[in-house]
């Protein structure tokens, strides 16, 4: 079974491609996490977990969900992580997670996809994003070939910098940067509730037709990047930046 969590669609796209290539069922963790559903999941022997990279590891919300949820029938697990640039030493923590689940760790693969973390970085314009997705195809094909053969992924790079970013920096990043305080709606907001619908942690509610953010945020960027009116800002960090979600790339270029 292919499990995935996504913020703005990159991981969903990769997970769908992998599930199609392996003829495996696809399981949406966003829906489970949003519903607080930790009932056992009948996965079968092989599990492929596809996630974005948050602070140089898999998202904390995903590792927490896995810690509470039995993967019935699972014996082996592969991790596929998409990122804007690098995953650090995420593989070391994925190995630990597999051991905690008493699963055979089959490796971690990195696939570069368009950046979406506009709370800190710049997202690409649409044409550049399309180019990045095209450039990701060889890596995706390698991952598919290795999965079809039941092979372990080759170990990713691991140096002192990687260990530092995934190690000490990760909890500091969550503590000081992963907050919803800076999100706000502009006058362009039409109160459609798209942000409320997409938030995997139920951290957004509408008050007087405008979104209000709570304290439980994972910085997935779904609210700000999917807003149809681009009416959400993250303090001054997001002003003037392109909003990125994968589905926009699938629309006609003149749309």
Task: For each feature predicted by the language model, list its residue ranges.
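Generic structural "secondary-structure junction" signal
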Residues: 56, 113, 208, 234, ...
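Iron-sulfur cluster-binding cysteine motifs and their immediate structural context
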Residues: 184-185, 190-212, 216-218, 222-239
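Short low-complexity, flexible loop/linker segments enriched in glycine and/or proline
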Residues: 41-42, 121-123, 220-222, 248-252
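Conserved short-loop catalytic and cofactor-binding motifs
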Residues: 50, 82, 128, 186-187, ...
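A mid-sequence, solvent-exposed acidic-amphipathic segment
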Residues: 159-191, 197
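Long, positively charged, glycine-interspersed low-complexity recognition regions
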Residues: 230-255
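FMN-binding flavodoxin-like domain, especially the glycine-rich phosphate-binding loop
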Residues: 1-2, 6-14, 20-32, 37, ...
